[in-house]
């Protein structure tokens, strides 16, 4: 039997090969508390205390460093942005009314702590083993490997096996 062809391969060439290394997360995923809805970021304690209108102190876009929320106010926030320090609740844009720089929650809206927040390391934490050696690499595995920060992996070609049956004992099917 020929030896398996093994070595480092680019992710684009890794599908259907046999993984020869553990794939370990280089960082937390997500790497920060990530907002999952456009809207406003508030402190849930302000909501519990009865506040339903919040002056908008800033806007935070995805990719910008996290801002710091002032008590009693809100930060307009976009999907994918880092959760501002001091905020622990996101109210979707569909549930607020904005006038004169103040966001007001719609009547009857119930805000929950940590709602619409994808928590840091909730998918996996730095150091977690994501894939074990010995598995056939699927297209989904390629996505996992890429999300772990790797552009190439140690992998082997799958062996090709053929069965050749011979002998007088063999009879045609049927």
Model-predicted regions and their roles:
Residues 1-51, 101, 119:
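Short, low-complexity N-terminal leaders and the immediately following helix N-cap/first helix
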Residues 40-174:
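Short, glycine/charged-enriched hinge/interface segments at domain edges or termini
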């Amino acid at each position: 039997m020929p030896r398996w062809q093994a070595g480092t391969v680019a992710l684009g060439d890794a599908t259907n090969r046999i993984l020869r290394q553990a794939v370990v997360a280089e960082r937390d995923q997500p790497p920060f508390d990530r907002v999952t809805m456009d809207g406003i970021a508030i402190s849930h304690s302000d909501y519990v205390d009865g506040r339903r209108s919040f002056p908008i102190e800033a806007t935070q876009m995805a990719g910008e460093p996290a801002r710091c929320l002032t008590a009693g106010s809100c930060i307009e926030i976009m999907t994918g942005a880092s959760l501002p320090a001091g905020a622990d609740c996101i109210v979707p844009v569909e549930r607020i009314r904005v006038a004169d720089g103040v966001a007001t929650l719609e009547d009857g809206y119930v805000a929950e702590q940590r709602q619409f927040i994808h928590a840091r390391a909730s998918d996996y934490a730095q150091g977690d083993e994501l894939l074990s050696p010995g598995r056939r690499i699927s297209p989904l595995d390629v996505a996992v490997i890429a999300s772990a920060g790797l552009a190439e992996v140690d992998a082997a070609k799958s062996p090709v096996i053929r069965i050749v049956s011979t002998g007088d004992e063999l009879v045609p099917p049927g």
